[in-house]
Design a protein with these regions (language model features):
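C-terminal lobe and adjacent flexible extensions of AdoMet/dcAdoMet transferase-like proteins
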Residues: 183, 200-253
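Catalytic cores of RNA-modifying enzymes
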Residues: 1-199, 228, 239, 248
């Protein structure tokens, strides 16, 4: 079977079981698997008695494979579509667990879409090491940035397990890890406004936060006032501000 869409198929039974173990701990009213590929996780979910769940697969060849090999008694709903283009109306509007060995090239976009959905409750996702470092980074860390902030403001993130390259076929060039996400109450500011402030701040990482936001068109006086309220110097850089402080900052912009 040909490899398309940057797939690296999970073949390590121990890792498969650890992912499914985590999924069952976080199980919700609806379960959705993204990009099942050959069905390694899907088969394990079904083997443990999970029924009537949904898988979303972009690759027509994989869809045909799944239709031929998944147990019919499990009642698995196969949606042949690009998850990033999926209309949420295709899913039930109930608390949902997402599970996936995420395609590396689309991982950040998929995570953002999932966390933004009002009915997201929990997720168990595998990422390449670089994404894991960015998602878990704190203010002042080397990998801290928008992905860190957007993830941590919407979910409690924990490490499930680390995954070596040999767990896949074909093996990727980098190591991976599995993260669990549990929904938290989002900040009480307009999300798009907060998003634009964060993205503008990190557009010029070598500049001070104040200068970066002024370059983006924000009013210098308002930013200065916000930084004073946060008790941080006007020379602070974007990577030195915590996610919670960005929420406060966005209220002034």
């Amino acid at each position: 079977m040909r490899q398309k869409y940057g797939q690296h198929f999970l073949i390590d039974k121990n890792i498969i079981c650890q992912i499914v173990d985590a999924a069952f701990l976080l199980r919700s009213e609806q379960v959705v698997e993204i990009g099942p590929g050959k069905g390694a996780l899907t088969m394990e979910l079904a083997a443990r008695g999970l029924t009537d769940f949904t898988v979303v697969e972009i690759d027509p060849e994989m869809v045909s494979f799944l239709r031929a090999h998944l147990p019919p008694q499990a009642g698995i709903n196969i949606v042949a579509e690009n998850f990033l283009k999926l209309d949420w109306a295709r899913l039930r509007a109930v608390p949902t667990l997402f599970i996936s060995n995420l395609p590396y090239m689309a991982a950040a976009d998929i995570l953002d879409k999932v966390l933004a959905w009002p009915h997201f409750k929990t997720a168990v996702f595998m990422f390449q090491k670089e994404h894991v470092q960015k998602i878990r980074a704190r203010a002042g860390d080397e990998f801290y940035g928008p992905l860190s902030i957007f993830s941590q403001l919407r979910a409690r993130v924990s490490l499930v397990c680390k995954v070596g390259r040999s767990a896949f076929a074909p093996p990727p060039k980098v190591e991976s890890a599995v993260l669990a996400f549990e929904k938290i109450t989002p900040p009480d500011v307009p999300w798009e406004k907060l998003r634009q402030v964060v993205l503008a701040s990190f557009l010029h990482r070598r500049k001070t936060l104040l200068n970066a936001l002024v370059l983006a068109g924000y009013e210098k006086e308002k930013i200065s006032a916000a930084l004073n309220i946060l008790h941080v110097p006007l020379t602070v850089r974007p990577e030195e501000i915590t996610a919670a402080q960005y929420v406060t900052l966005s209220r002034f912009c």
